[in-house]
UniProtKB/Swiss-Prot annotation:
Spans annotated as G5: 177-179
UniProtKB keywords: Cytoplasm, Elongation factor, GTP-binding, Hydrolase, Magnesium, Metal-binding, Nucleotide-binding, Protein biosynthesis
Region (G3): 84-87
Family statement: Belongs to the TRAFAC class translation factor GTPase superfamily. Classic translation factor GTPase family. EF-Tu/EF-1A subfamily.
Organism per entry: Streptococcus agalactiae serotype Ia (strain ATCC 27591 / A909 / CDC SS700)
One matching Pfam family: GTP_EFTU
Stretches for region G1: 19-26
Binding residues for GTP: 19-26, 84-88, 139-142
Gene Ontology MF terms in the entry: GTP binding; GTPase activity; translation elongation factor activity
Name assigned to this protein: Elongation factor Tu
């Protein structure tokens, strides 16, 4: 059966849920899909239950390629792709790939707890990876009888957001109960609809980088028997069309060429994929083992693999979940670019003995294998699975 075409008539926006473990991110995601399916029944709006979204349980072995649930839904005004990023600290890596895919996010905070360590961490990560627009959903308000307590929690959340340069005083805070809405309580269903109209209004339609040269960070690779190899990910910038020639850049010294033979989004065929779309790209002339997560698909000649660069970095303080001790010259952490970790060594500027948690500094980095980078590429510095710094490439050296 031919796949149905993907409808482009509404503006498309990528959002997601972030926040502390057990504060109700996944329940809210389920509530949004379920309430929209009840109130605005369309072919896109299908209810998803908690279990089907919760695709990344904490007890599952790590090393799953990606543990982020993607759901789609629409309001009267827009089409949304929604990412549910798991809450546990072990999945911060995922938060980084997930948050990088959001035009805006709903920060879920349980009214019973208020902001918790991962609330802070996710706000910080959002700031680092360029998620500029946050809306707060204070969940579980049905469990709090004291109006003053709710006001205090809201103030605390707003202060925390301001601390990380978000407009804490001005951004929208919606109080509700995802579980009650999911169970069909009309009052709380109305609040979900209010939340979605706030998302429609407050998160601006993203400026898509469609005019720039194609860059698509590869998140996952699989092969379709008889058709070829598919690389999937979110198009960072540019467009990809059937018959385009692309280059596969990074990890390996050599740049490989391939031809695009198909583009799909949400299992529907597209004529072209645009910046911001989560797509699967079918490639001719590439074996399944010749392309991997961490590489990028790019317009030929637009980006090269590099191992040496200068970067401006901020090293997280102990309070932000960073290191407790300084590091010295030749420190060898992992550098997390787009979808993958690469080990590299850090050279400090002349005269700098060491870098303390909370410092920012210009460093020279040498990676153990090349990555597609350019001036302005952002990265995180990680060690043993936790983020200890964030940075941006200021100058390419080799």
């Amino acid at each position: 059966m031919a796949k149905e075409k993907y409808d482009r008539s509404k503006p498309h926006v990528n959002i997601g849920t972030i926040g502390h473990v057990d504060h109700g991110k996944t329940t809210l995601t389920a509530a949004i899909t379920t309430v929209l399916a009840r109130r605005l029944p369309t072919s896109v709006n299908q209810p998803k239950d908690y279990a089907s979204i919760d695709a990344a349980p904490e007890e599952r072995e790590r090393g799953i390629t990606i543990n982020t649930a993607h759901v789609e839904y629409e309001t009267e005004k827009r089409h949304y792709a929604h990412i549910d990023a798991p809450g546990h600290a072990d999945y911060v890596k995922n938060m980084i790939t997930g948050a990088a895919q959001m035009d805006g996010a709903i920060l879920v905070v349980a009214s019973t707890d208020g902001p918790m360590p991962q609330t802070r961490e996710h706000i910080l990560l959002s700031r680092q990876v360029g998620v500029k627009h946050l809306i707060v959903f204070m969940n579980k308000v049905d469990l709090v009888d004291d109006e003053e307590l709710l006001e205090l929690v809201e103030m605390e959340i707003r202060d925390l957001l301001s601390e990380y340069d978000f407009p804490g005083d001005d951004l929208p805070v919606i109080q509700g109960s995802a579980l009650k809405a999911l169970e069909g309580d009309e009052k709380y269903e109305d609040i979900i609809m209010e939340l979605m109209s706030t998302v429609d209004e407050y998160i601006p339609e993203p400026e898509r980088d469609t005019d720039k040269p194609l860059l698509l960070p590869v998140e996952d690779v699989f092969s379709i028997t008889g058709r070829g190899t598919v690389a999937s990910g979110r198009i960072d910038r540019g467009t990809v069309r059937v018959n385009d020639e692309v280059e596969i850049v990074g990890i390996k010294e050599d740049i490989q060429k391939a031809v695009v033979t198909g583009v799909e989004m949400f299992r529907k065929q597209l004529d072209e994929g645009l910046a911001g779309d989560n797509v699967g790209v079918l490639l001719r002339g590439v074996q399944r083992d010749e392309i991997e997560r961490g590489q990028v698909l790019a317009k030929p000649g637009s980006i090269n693999p590099h191992t040496k660069f200068k970067g401006e970095v901020y090293i997280l303080s102990k309070e932000e979940g960073g290191r407790h001790t300084p590091f010295f010259n030749n420190y060898r952490p992992q550098f997390y670019f787009r979808t993958t970790d690469v080990t590299g060594s850090i050279e400090l500027p002349a005269g700098t003995e060491m870098v303390m948690p909370g410092d920012n500094v210009t460093i020279e980095v040498e990676l153990i294998h090349p990555i597609a980078v350019e001036q302005g590429t952002t990265f995180s510095i990680r060690e043993g699975g936790r983020t200890v710094g964030s940075g941006i490439v200021s100058e390419i050296e080799a």
